[in-house]
């Protein structure tokens, strides 16, 4: 919830915008 719908690659939750977590597919969501 509250995660901007922007495709962002990540390795960890802190790579993502506020409200997002790093998913298993390597993208924030």
From Swiss-Prot:
Site features described as Reactive bond, chain residue numbers: 5-6
Subcellular location: Secreted
Pfam families: Squash
Cellular component GO terms, alphabetical: extracellular region
One GO MF term attached to the UniProt entry: serine-type endopeptidase inhibitor activity
Alphabetical keyword list: Disulfide bond, Knottin, Protease inhibitor, Secreted, Serine protease inhibitor
Disulphide connectivity of cysteines: 3-20, 10-22, 16-28
Keyword ATP-binding attributed: no
UniProt xrefs under CDD domains: PlantTI
UniProt remark on domains: The presence of a 'disulfide through disulfide knot' structurally defines this protein as a knottin.
Family: Belongs to the protease inhibitor I7 (squash-type serine protease inhibitor) family.
Function: Inhibits trypsin.
Protein name (record): Trypsin inhibitor 2
């Amino acid at each position: 919830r509250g995660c901007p719908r922007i495709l962002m690659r990540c390795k960890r939750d802190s790579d993502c915008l506020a409200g997002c977590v790093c998913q298993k597919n390597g993208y924030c969501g």
